[in-house]
Amino acid sequence: MAEATQSVLIQYIIVQRDQVPIGWRILADGRYERTAADNALPTPTEPLDRDRALNWQPTGTITAEQIQVIEKTARDSGFFNLQPRLLINYCKDDPGVAIWTVNVDGQQKRVVVYDPKPKRAAEIDKLKALLTELIGA
């Protein structure tokens, strides 16, 4: 399914030069999707941190209570206080990126983490741990 105007609650996408983008998103109505395998590789000169149209594969649904847990975790984690770009240990020539987008209570935040790995930002680690627990992301 191609990206549409659905309301995204939380989404993360990992983009690397030599791999198709991978990621998950949960829509405001509780449906969750993962990136489809037929997405194209980034071009050799394309900035990895730009938003791109992706195909998504429906995967399941979470409950209203689980949506509330995600919203609370996003608010309480400090995610909305992060800088828009996290250049942590930035020493690679063309590092991959993780692009996180969260929409809660009318507030939207997009954070790009360069060379994404666990323990780059505690705020993001909390959200990632919750997504792993809820949907296996």
Annotate the PLM regions.
Residues 35-82:
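A short-motif feature that recognizes glycine-rich, charge-decorated loops
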Residues 22-24, 36:
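Short, surface-exposed binding/anchoring microloops in extracellular/periplasmic proteins
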Residues 1-18, 22, 65, 72-73, ...:
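Short, well-ordered, aromatic-rich surface patches in folded extracellular/luminal domains
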Residues 28-32:
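Structural signal for glycine-centered tight turns and loop->strand junctions in beta-sheet-rich domains
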